[in-house]
Structures are given as structure tokens and as C-alpha cells.
A protein has these predicted regions:
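Mg2+-dependent endonuclease catalytic cores in nucleic-acid-processing enzymes, primarily RNase H-like
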Residues: 2-31, 39-43, 60, 64, ...
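A short catalytic or substrate-binding loop motif that flags glycine-/basic-rich loops and adjacent residues
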Residues: 90-92, 105-110, 244
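Short, glycine/acidic-enriched loop or turn micro-motifs at the edges of active sites
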Residues: 102-104, 169
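Well-ordered alpha-helical segments embedded in enzymatic catalytic cores
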Residues: 113, 146-150, 249
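Conserved RecA-like P-loop NTPase helicase motor core
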Residues: 222, 245-249
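Acidic two-metal-ion nuclease catalytic site recognized across multiple nuclease folds
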Residues: 254-280
């Protein structure tokens, strides 16, 4: 044997002890106050969410299958986006994304969901402003074109010209169909192709849970009339229960995208009062 002459009499690391020092001790004091103050620790918790903070900073790992998405953590609002001031209520919007996670849209299949999302990157708040669930009659001969027309109507009413489309599986040819439908309308749009490689459950959990657990996920009240809240209640990382999660997947995809910068309409335009008190 190769290691016969170098055999160890005792197993490697026999009798070792694990040293665990969480960033905050049992009394709530920082373990290293000169590096991590109370304010800095609170900021970290707000950024990564309670689950990741517990695992990485408190050394208390939470099994992913125990994770859930509680709709009680959502913060609802009624205000519409004010493009002139680039605001939703008191919040200044810095970016937006329109994201489409497509499917056939037929009954007994995955839902096709399109999400409009705004962001306030100063406060790290995310606003799910609208979720469009697309359905197609079983008799429809061209289900993808039918959905493209509905999405284009959605974009036109909100004065949007850019959309990100997930191209995994059925969506691989959808950007071309979307451009063709827009061309026939005379609409000028930009389509961004998105290919996801991570599992759906990881995408949903890692994108939504940190925002939800820290009170940074805002949802327009109209979305209470969609299947989204039922999706949250029935969702499990293991997929147990067979509940649809297509709206959640679309929101996760939108959160992961680089937002399009948003600026107030007419920003930089100043008014001047002319001095007309002169004689010729």
C-alpha cells in the first residue's frame, strides 16, 4: 500500500473541539465591537435577511426546507408611479424592470407571468407594482403571439419600451415573436434575453426572502386580486404540495435583473422670469 509506512496511529484531528463565536453574543453585544458596531450589524441583517444572517453571522444554520414566504411580511400601498417626480408615494424611484416568465398560458399548465417592478436603491426597497397573469384559450392556434399582444398592450398603457424575457425552454423563440408583433404595431421596443441556470426554488428563496423578512418588499394593493398571495402561502422550497409558483418566479427574476435607471420627466429643466422693465 502507498501509505503503509506512513500510517497514523490515531485519526487526523481526533479529539478536536469546534470554536464558534457568533457576531452577537447571548447578551446582544457585538463579539468584535471595534469592527462591527450595533449599527453595522443591524445594517448587515437588513441587507442579507434574517435567514442568511442567522446562518452566516450567528452560525445557526436554517435548513432551506424550513423556509417559507409569509404574505404578512408584505407592505401594501395604493399610490401609482408618478413619472414626473419619479416617485411612488414618498419613495424616490431609481430603477424599474419589466420581466416576463413565459409559458403556454393554457389550462393545467404553468402560468405565464409578467411583472412590473420598481426600486428605490437608496433605501433598498422593492415595489412589485403589477403582476400580469396571461391565459390563452385552448382553441387559440398561436398562444405565444396571443400573449405577446397582451404584453404589448400592458407596455403601451404604462409607457414602457423595454422588457426582459426568460428564454429557458418554451421562451427561447419568444423575443423574436415579440419583436415581430411589435413591428406590426409600429412599436419600437427593446427585448433583453435572460437565461436562468439556478434552480427555481433557489432563485425564489434567495431573491424574495431577504426582502420579505426585513420589510423591504412593497406590493401594490391590486395584486391582492391575483394568485400571488396564494402562491406564497402554498410555496415550499421542496416543491411539496404541487402549488403553482410562476408569479413568484417572475418576481425573483425581476429582482435579480439590473434595473433600468429612472429619472423624473423634465429633470434639469428650469424656469426663468424675464426682466421686461426696460425702455427702447
Amino acid at each position: 500500500m502507498v501509505y503503509e509506512k506512513n500510517a497514523f496511529s490515531t485519526p487526523f484531528l481526533s479529539g478536536y473541539k469546534v470554536l464558534k463565536i457568533p457576531i452577537v453574543n447571548a447578551c446582544g453585544d457585538p463579539a468584535w465591537p471595534e469592527l462591527f458596531s450595533h449599527a453595522r450589524i443591524a445594517q448587515m441583517r437588513e441587507t442579507v435577511g434574517h435567514r442568511h444572517f442567522s446562518a452566516q453571522m450567528m452560525l445557526n444554520f436554517v435548513q432551506p426546507e424550513r423556509a417559507h414566504l409569509d404574505p404578512a411580511g408584505l407592505r401594501f400601498y395604493d399610490e401609482e408611479f408618478d413619472a414626473h417626480r419619479s416617485k411612488i408615494g414618498p419613495h424616490t424611484i431609481t430603477g424599474m424592470i419589466l420581466y416576463w416568465d413565459p409559458s403556454s398560458g393554457r389550462r393545467r399548465h404553468d402560468a405565464s407571468a409578467c411583472v412590473l417592478l420598481y426600486r428605490d436603491d437608496r433605501t433598498k426597497y422593492v415595489f412589485v407594482h403589477d403582476v400580469l397573469y396571461l391565459t390563452v384559450p385552448d382553441t387559440e392556434k398561436y398562444p405565444l403571439s396571443h400573449q405577446c399582444e397582451s404584453v404589448l398592450d400592458f407596455m403601451r398603457t404604462r409607457n414602457l419600451y423595454r422588457i426582459s424575457i426568460e428564454v429557458n425552454g418554451l421562451g427561447i423563440g419568444l423575443p423574436e415573436i415579440m419583436r415581430d408583433c411589435a413591428l406590426r404595431r409600429g412599436a419600437n421596443i427593446f427585448v433583453n434575453r435572460v437565461k436562468n441556470t439556478k434552480s427555481k426554488s433557489d432563485r425564489i428563496l434567495n431573491a424574495i426572502e431577504p426582502l420579505l423578512s426585513t420589510g423591504r418588499l412593497y406590493v401594490h394593493s391590486r395584486i391582492q386580486n391575483t394568485p400571488l398571495l396564494a402562491e406564497m402561502l402554498g410555496w415550499s422550497p421542496t416543491g411539496v404540495g404541487g402549488m403553482h409558483d410562476d408569479g413568484l418566479d417572475a418576481i425573483a427574476g425581476a429582482i435579480a435583473q439590473t434595473p433600468i435607471p429612472v429619472h423624473p420627466i423634465g429633470s434639469g429643466v428650469k424656469t426663468y422670469a424675464a426682466n421686461t422693465n426696460f425702455s427702447v
